């Protein structure tokens, strides 16, 4: 089959890593795959993509006649049968694609990689509202939030109606999609989770090789990741567990603030590593702590579990329950509308930090659970999708 991935960008983000992993897997299984990206690709992501995958760069992120013509030429030259639009929002990729494929027998799939009813723009307004006590400004912010929410809802509904299949990452997002978009019976909505994108086939779990280390892996920002919560939790553990350490692997706009937070608290065993290859950290760490305000289907969860790292995750999005069974293969930290409870999270971590037998049991269960998200298993599900699309032509 001839498949094209349509990308807004092809850099080092999670969506791009998923696309690179799937594209490379499809090629290994005999498919012909090309990638078209509106903006120039990052060398690191290109390097992790199978060299048999040809990558084309369009002329910027716009639905222009030039981009439509360029994309149409790619579709025809490679006799594309299926396009996977990895940006289920916003409208530009969908509109450009539909103009480019006009008159061609091509099936389309749009994938939305986040929680259905929120995004960075909406969350920014909510953050501003938390700190605003001026009645007039609050009214303006509420109106802004309503406008952003409406635009997001209408855009999502538009893309859904102009694609053959629309994918979300969790079964729990199906009713949320209907509520958010107003589409009561979304008959071509489907659930498809992301694969583990990091190869752990050469990893042999040994409890004795695991260090007493908690890690955070990812971007350091306030809007989504809320890494300050990781530090708040660690402040309640550092003195009690002098042989444990916290390692922050990642970078971002909030890093300086988080480093200041660590200094202000007088914490001694916190290391900031910047962006690094995650595998060595997964191989040695015992626990991963993720305290995001919202997510879609975080790649780091299944990834860390495949290396026997126990995930401790704030239950701020419904997909958490798809991945983790609390107390068996991970820890689900309860969500509270009034805010993250660091003391409660610390108590839950405390229970396994001091219990080696429990940690080993949970690590082994996590490894077993991660197999549900192996690349080959997810590939098999994609094959069924392709078959269904083409046989229902």
Identify the function of each model-found stretch.
Residues 310-314, 324:
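Short hydrophobic beta-strand element within catalytic cores of glycosyltransferases
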Residues 54, 257-275:
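Nucleotide-activated donor-binding/catalytic signature segment of Leloir-type glycosyltransferases, i.e.
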Residues 293:
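Aromatic "clamp/platform" in nucleotide-sugar-dependent glycosyltransferases that forms part
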Residues 5-13, 19, 25-63, 173-176, ...:
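N-terminal strand-loop element at the rim of the active site
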Residues 145-188:
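A short, active-site helix/loop in glycosyltransferases that binds the activated sugar's phosphate group
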């Amino acid at each position: 089959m001839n498949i094209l991935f349509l990308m807004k960008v092809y850099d080092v983000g999670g969506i791009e890593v998923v696309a690179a992993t799937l594209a490379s897997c499809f090629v290994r299984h005999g498919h012909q795959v090309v990638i078209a990206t509106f903006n120039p690709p990052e060398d690191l992501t290109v390097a992790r993509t199978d060299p048999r995958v040809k990558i084309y760069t369009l002329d910027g992120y716009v639905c222009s006649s030039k981009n439509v013509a360029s994309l149409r030429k790619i579709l025809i030259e490679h006799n594309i049968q299926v396009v996977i639009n990895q940006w289920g929002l916003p409208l530009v990729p969908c509109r450009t694609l539909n103009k480019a494929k006009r008159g061609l027998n091509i099936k389309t799939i749009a994938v939305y990689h986040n929680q259905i009813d929120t995004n960075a723009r909406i969350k920014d307004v909510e953050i501003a509202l938390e700190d605003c006590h001026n009645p007039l400004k609050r009214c303006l912010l509420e109106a802004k939030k309503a406008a952003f929410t409406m635009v997001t809802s209408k855009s999502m509904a538009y893309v859904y109606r102009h694609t053959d299949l629309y994918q979300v990452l969790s079964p729990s997002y199906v009713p949320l999609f209907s509520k958010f978009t107003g589409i009561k019976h979304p008959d071509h909505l489907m659930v498809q989770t992301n694969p583990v994108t990091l190869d752990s086939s050469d990893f042999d779990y040994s409890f004795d090789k695991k260090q007493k280390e908690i890690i955070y892996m990812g971007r350091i920002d306030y809007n989504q990741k809320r890494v300050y919560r990781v530090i708040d939790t660690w402040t309640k553990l550092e003195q009690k567990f002098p042989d444990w350490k916290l390692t922050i692997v990642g970078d971002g706009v909030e890093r300086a603030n988080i480093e200041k937070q660590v200094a202000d608290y007088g914490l001694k065993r916190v290391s900031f590593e910047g962006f690094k290859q995650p595998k060595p950290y997964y191989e040695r760490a015992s626990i991963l702590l993720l305290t995001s305000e919202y997510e879609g289907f975080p790649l780091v969860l299944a990834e860390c579990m495949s290396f026997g790292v126990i995930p401790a995750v704030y239950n701020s999005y419904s997909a958490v329950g798809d991945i983790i069974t609390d107390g068996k293969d991970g820890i689900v930290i309860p969500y509270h509308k009034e805010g993250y409870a660091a003391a409660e999270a610390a108590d839950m971590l405390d229970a396994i930090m001091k219990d080696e037998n429990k940690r080993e049991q949970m690590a082994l269960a996590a490894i077993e659970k991660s197999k549900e998200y192996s690349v080959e298993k997810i590939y098999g599900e994609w094959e069924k999708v392709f078959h269904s699309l083409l046989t229902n032509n």
